[in-house]
């Protein structure tokens, strides 16, 4: 089956979060299962270089009147060799900063044009006007940055229209822009409506994907239910409830080629799951690297996360004084909201042997955190799927997490029964407040001191298997249900 997978970030070419991990691993798993997959990505300079994309395979023209022609480049995804197409438009993508923000952390003012071009290209490659002969049977778009792709196909109504799948990785990010962009982006005025991509007097890229795609997926069964409610739907709950029959929750997977403690080149000491001595060596090395006291019996809690309220980092700061009184150490790597960054910096300055804060994301340090930590703190207020708990399982680091989204789908709280049956793989709290979070931490610290019981929990963590094979199989089934014996069925125009 021919699948075009469109995303704004793909690991290891460019990464700001979990979307990149999924966009690198899922296409690779689909290709390994025999599917004919192409990845479409913006032509960020580093991504062009890392993919080896030197060959131009066709012109994309200048659809938005930028005065600069866009070109389609062809490269390969390092590691898996999956073909990658990159939208090379220096006027939009060749700049310092990140994929979405400038070096000062401000959204690029032309993000609407940047990601409209990505969406336009995804749809264009599905039509008879494509610069390449290869035509997808399925167009799989991801998050708001590619949400206009199904809308373009709706507007153009090509003779051979592929099936369209739109995956929500985080519904909080919606890509809302001024309505006066609609004609410039090439859409007829009637599509700017409640039954279209209009959202409270703005053009919403996310709503476009939700409204015009044939099927909607999100990254865990629990999150698929949550986003149909006002508490989690971020204003889209009505549309999602209306399309509930077309909405499926499929858990993400973990890339165990990348996250494998036995072959992890980022570690000081490679170790196999269940190797307590190897785990202890990595803990000691991490404590030394971060300037924490060399205390093998102190529970070392790690955080590998964006630092914002939706990740519950304010709860960590509020509970931190009591956590430190328990004799624990806390190590943080991540970036996010300035007040939270400053809060962790201040805590590290006040307690340098118990708290370490590394502001800014480091993939190698994230691996060493997983290897050296005893517990992973994930107090997220909402968590569509979560990937770090999968990595933690493999590295023997026990999650302490809020029961939401994919965390609720993948964690079994530690209690007498679950501990005795070998099912307990974490410490879960139901209510998102400081008291509930702190109680979960206290339970974890209490059992950490009982090594026989802690070993049971670590063993259960190591036994979890969230590789991409199962998830890729579910996506293949979904694609087949949409295409039948070939060719997309497509959603009919209203």
Curated annotation (Swiss-Prot):
Provide the GO MF annotations for this entry. Answer: alpha-1,4-glucan glucosyltransferase (ADP-glucose donor) activity; alpha-1,4-glucan glucosyltransferase (UDP-glucose donor) activity
Query: What SUPFAM superfamilies does this protein map onto?
Result: UDP-Glycosyltransferase/glycogen phosphorylase
- Which Gene Ontology biological process is one annotated for this entry? glycogen biosynthetic process
Domain of life (superkingdom): Bacteria
Question: Keywords on this record?
Answer: Glycogen biosynthesis, Glycosyltransferase, Transferase
- Cystine pairs: none
Listed Pfam families: Glyco_transf_5, Glycos_transf_1
Where along this sequence does the record place binding of ADP-alpha-D-glucose? 15
Q: Name one GO cellular component term.
A: cytosol
Known EC number? 2.4.1.21
**Pathway the protein contributes to:** Glycan biosynthesis; glycogen biosynthesis
Chemical reaction(s) catalysed: [(1->4)-alpha-D-glucosyl](n) + ADP-alpha-D-glucose = [(1->4)-alpha-D-glucosyl](n+1) + ADP + H(+)
* Protein family per UniProt: Belongs to the glycosyltransferase 1 family. Bacterial/plant glycogen synthase subfamily.
This chain's function reads: Synthesizes alpha-1,4-glucan chains using ADP-glucose.
HAMAP family found in the cross-reference section: Glycogen_synth
Identification of the protein by name: Glycogen synthase
Question: What is the species of this protein?
Answer: Paramagnetospirillum magneticum (strain ATCC 700264 / AMB-1)
The organism's lineage is: Bacteria, Pseudomonadati, Pseudomonadota, Alphaproteobacteria, Rhodospirillales
